[in-house]
Amino acid sequence: MSESEVAGQRYRVGYALQGKKVESFIQPSLLDHAKQHSIDLVQIDPTAPLQQQGPFHCIIHKLHTQHWKNLLQQFSSKHPNTVIIDPPELVDRLHNRVSMLDAVTHLQFSLENATIGVPKQVVVNEPKSFDLHKFEEEQGLRFPVIAKPLAADGGAGSHELCLVFDEEGLHALSVPMVLQEFVNHGGVVFKIYVAGQRVNCVKRKSLGDITEEKLKVLRGSLPFSRVSSLGVEDEGGGAVEDAEMPPQSLVGELARGLREALGLNLFNVDVIRDGKEPTRYLVIDINYFPGYAKLPSYEPFITDFLLDIVRSKTA
C-alpha cells in the first residue's frame, strides 16, 4: 500500500462496552485524537445485528454475555478480515483467578538482576471447613492471606478482596475463594498497561507492610477498603513517589511474554516487589481491558495501538 493511500485511508473501529466503561474510556479527548489520526470510533449496539452496523476494520469489546459472543462469532465468520480485540474464549481465562496466573508460571525468559513469579495460593471451595494449616506444612502458605473471589469476571462481588488473619476470619467467608500469600512490598504496586506492542508502567499505592508486632493483635478478617483503619498502610514506610521502578527489561519481557501466552492485546498486570528480596517480583493480578484513561496521555497510547492493528491488517 502506497503512502498516499495510507494518508487518505480512514478506519472504522467499533466498540462494544458497558455504560460505565463507555463513560470512562470513550472520552471526547480520545475520540478527537483518534479522529485526527484517521480512526473513527463507532459505538456498537449489542442488541442489534452487527451486520447492519458495519463495516468495521476492528472491533474492541468488553461484554461477556453469551448473546454477544454469538453475535461476534457470526459476524467474524462472515467478515474474517475484521480484527476482533480480543477473542472472547481467550478473555475468559482471565475470569478465573487461578488460570489467569498460570501463564506467568510458564513464561520462558531470563533476567540478569530480577526474577518474576506468582505468590503461593490455593483454591478454597468451602471456606467454612477449610484448614490452612495443612497447606502451611505442604506449601508454606500461612496467615495472613489475601482472600479473592475465584471469579474475576467484573461482577459486583469479584472485587471484594479481604485480608484474613486467622481461621475464624477464613471460616467467615462464603463464596469459593483463592487464598494468596500476603507479601510485604512497601505499599507500592506496579501496574503494567499493555495495548499490543505498546507498554506503560506506573506505580500506585497498595496495602502497606504488616509488622510481626501488628500480626500478634490482628484477628478475623478485614475488607481492603478498611485496612487503612488499622494503620497498616503506613507500616511500610516507603512512599509511592520514592519507590524505584522495576527494570525496563522486566517490564518489556513480562508484557511481551504474557501477550503471547494469553493471546491478548488489552490488559494490565499488577506486580509487587518482595520487601525481603528486592530482586523478586510477583504478579498478583491480571485484568482485561483495564482503566486506560488513568494513564497519562492515554489517547495516543490507545490510538497508536489501534493504528498498529488496522494498518497491519490492511497492509
From Swiss-Prot:
Q: Does the keyword field hold Kinase? A: yes
Q: Which Gene3D superfamilies match?
A: 3.30.1490.220, 3.40.50.11370, ATP-grasp fold, B domain
Q: Where is this region: Catalytic specificity elements (CSE)?
A: 214-240
InterPro entries (UniProt xref): ATP-grasp (IPR011761), Inositol_tetrakis-P_1-kinase (IPR008656), InsP(3)kin_ATP-grasp (IPR040464), ITPK1_N (IPR041429)
Domain ATP-grasp, chain residue ranges per copy: 108-314
The EC class name is transferase
Keywords of this protein's UniProt record, alphabetized? Answer: ATP-binding, Kinase, Magnesium, Metal-binding, Nucleotide-binding, Stress response, Transferase
Cofactor binding summary note: Binds 2 magnesium ions per subunit.
Q: Which cofactor does it need?
A: Mg(2+)
List positions binding ATP: R97, K148, H159, Q180, V183, S206, I284, D285, N287
- Coiled-coil positions: none
Induction of expression: Induced by drought (early dehydration responsive) and salinity stress. Triggered by abscisic acid (ABA).
One Gene Ontology term of the molecular function aspect: ATP binding
Tissue note: Expressed in seeds. Mainly expressed in seedlings, and, to a lower extent, in roots, flowers, stems and leaves.
Say yes or no: keyword Transmembrane helix present: no
| Chain residues that bind Mg(2+) 1 | D270, D285
Give the function comment from the record: Kinase that can phosphorylate various inositol polyphosphate such as Ins(3,4,5,6)P4, Ins(3,4,6)P3 and Ins(1,3,4)P3. May participate in an inositol lipid-independent pathway of InsP6 synthesis. Barely able to add a beta-phosphate to InsP6 to yield 5-InsP7, thus exhibiting negligible InsP6 kinase activity. Also has Ins(1,3,4,5,6)P5 phosphatase activity. Probably involved in the regulation of drought and salinity tolerance by diverting the flux of inositol phosphate pool towards phytate biosynthesis.
Subunit structure comment from the entry: Monomer.
Record's family? Belongs to the ITPK1 family.
Q: What name appears for this protein in its UniProt entry?
A: Inositol-tetrakisphosphate 1-kinase 2
Q: Which organism is it from?
A: Glycine max (Soybean)
